[in-house]
A protein has these predicted regions:
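Acidic, metal-coordinating catalytic segment for phosphate/diphosphate chemistry
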Residues: 1-37
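Conserved beta-strand and immediately adjacent loop positions that scaffold enzyme active sites
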Residues: 37, 46, 129
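Conserved Nudix-box catalytic region and its N-terminal flanking loop in Nudix hydrolases
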Residues: 42-81
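Unchanged
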Residues: 65-88, 96-152, 175-176
């Protein structure tokens, strides 16, 4: 596009009402779905994984945000809906962007609040199984769950970083 035409279009765009500008931007930019997932860690280092009825591999508890919902609120809601646990979110989240299928996942670390039941049963019809898994005994993970764990490990610091790196089988920076 010639520079003069580009400038003219930007000036016209700038004169549009705010709502019209937002509509144009939404129309012309790619849209992504946004999910919130969490790594729930027990005191012994085991993490809680879920198996969805429509997938073979294991994944993290969580799901898509509802319209207007904050990611941290969505992850708390999803964990209660799927497995009946109340969790405390710990630290800063990691963000995983998947250009295809155009999805952004906000991944939190969390720990359960209150006493844990001996067995955690799925509460959602979309979850077929729920289990705690120790770091050396992880089952086959969904691709997005594996990516979330790696991203969270790479953004963590201190003792948490060591535990997450061991969980995903990746050396800490400087250990290579």
């Amino acid at each position: 596009m010639p520079a003069g035409l580009h400038v003219l279009l930007l000036r016209v765009f700038g004169r549009l009402p705010v709502q019209a500008r937002r509509a144009v931007v939404r129309l012309l930019t790619p849209s992504f779905t946004v999910g919130a997932n969490c790594v729930i860690e027990r005191d012994d280092g085991a993490i809680l994984l879920v198996r969805q009825v429509y997938r073979k591999q294991w994944g993290l508890p969580g799901g898509l945000l509802e319209r207007g919902e904050e990611p941290v609120d969505a992850v708390r809601r999803e964990v209660v809906e799927e497995v009946g646990l109340t969790v405390e979110v710990v630290g800063e989240p990691a963000v995983v962007v998947a250009p295809e299928p155009r999805r952004v996942d906000v991944v939190f670390r969390a720990r359960p609040l209150g006493p844990l039941p001996d067995v955690i049963e799925p509460l959602s019809p979309e979850i077929s199984a729920v289990r705690w898994h120790l770091p050396g005994e992880l089952p086959e993970l969904q691709e997005e769950a594996a990516q979330a764990l790696v991203t969270l490990a790479r953004s963590a610091t201190g003792e948490i970083a060591g535990r997450l790196h061991r969980l995903v089988g990746e050396p800490l920076p400087g250990e290579r």
